[in-house]
Curated annotation (Swiss-Prot):
Monomer. The modification Phosphotyrosine is found at Y24. Its main location: secreted. Changing C162Y: Variant found in a clone obtained from a fibroblast cell line; does not form the essential disulfide bond; results in loss of antiviral activity. The lineage of its organism: Eukaryota, Metazoa, Chordata, Craniata, Vertebrata. This is Interferon beta. Keywords: Antiviral defense, Cytokine, Disulfide bond, Glycoprotein, Pharmaceutical, Phosphoprotein, Secreted, Signal. It comes from Homo sapiens (Human). Residues 1-21 form the signal peptide. GO terms for biological process: adaptive immune response; B cell activation involved in immune response; B cell proliferation; cell surface receptor signaling pathway; cell surface receptor signaling pathway via JAK-STAT; cell surface receptor signaling pathway via STAT; cellular response to exogenous dsRNA; cellular response to interferon-beta. InterPro entries: 4_helix_cytokine-like_core (IPR009079), Interferon_alpha/beta/delta (IPR000471). Glycans are attached at N101. SMART domains: IFabd (SM00076). The gene is IFNB1. Belongs to the alpha/beta interferon family. CDD domains: IFab (cd00095).
């Protein structure tokens, strides 16, 4: 009985992973749902922007993200993947000075990690099957520099409450762009 149940679960997991990796529509649906959940969690983190206006900074998000051109599905998926990896790295930093509910931060990290894994599954399979080069993709160097500026800002401000409030708003803005990129994941 137990072996039969385990076999069914294993088959279901294999099927769902394969089905996910084959369908950008499903990926887009899951991505939109997860993006919404991440935005909701970010809004739950306290921090009043009006008290931190003196700490505002233009992190200069790459033009390729602000002015979305026609992205191929794979390009959009890879860009979202890179953005989520960097968001994950940012929220793994010391946020103890914020007074944020750690459960909310942990849920945010878990949600972002889950999205990263879904995208990784799709990207690995597509990269194996299709021959597309990183030359076609938006420069990930611009993204790395952008997120580097955010991390440098947090460090320079000694991970203060206001610095985190500014970064939280910037990451909310990131999810707006991720939502737009998610639109390119349709089959």
């Amino acid at each position: 009985m137990t072996n039969k149940c385990l076999l069914q679960i294993a088959l279901l997991l294999c099927f769902s992973t394969t089905a996910l990796s084959m369908s950008y529509n499903l990926l887009g649906f899951l991505q939109r749902s997860s993006n919404f959940q991440c935005q909701k969690l970010l809004w739950q983190l306290n921090g009043r922007l009006e008290y931190c206006l003196k700490d505002r900074m233009n992190f200069d998000i790459p033009e390729e993200i602000k002015q979305l051109q026609q992205f191929q599905k794979e390009d959009a998926a890879l860009t979202i993947y890179e953005m989520l990896q960097n968001i994950f790295a940012i929220f793994r930093q010391d946020s103890s000075s914020t007074g944020w509910n750690e459960t909310i931060v942990e849920n945010l990290l878990a949600n972002v990690y889950h999205q990263i894994n879904h995208l990784k599954t799709v990207l690995e399979e597509k990269l194996e099957k299709e021959d597309f080069t990183r030359g076609k993709l938006m420069s990930s160097l611009h993204l790395k520099r952008y997120y580097g500026r955010i991390l440098h800002y947090l460090k320079a401000k000694e991970y203060s409450h206001c610095a985190w409030t500014i970064v939280r708003v910037e990451i909310l803005r990131n999810f707006y762009f991720i939502n737009r990129l998610t639109g390119y994941l349709r089959n």
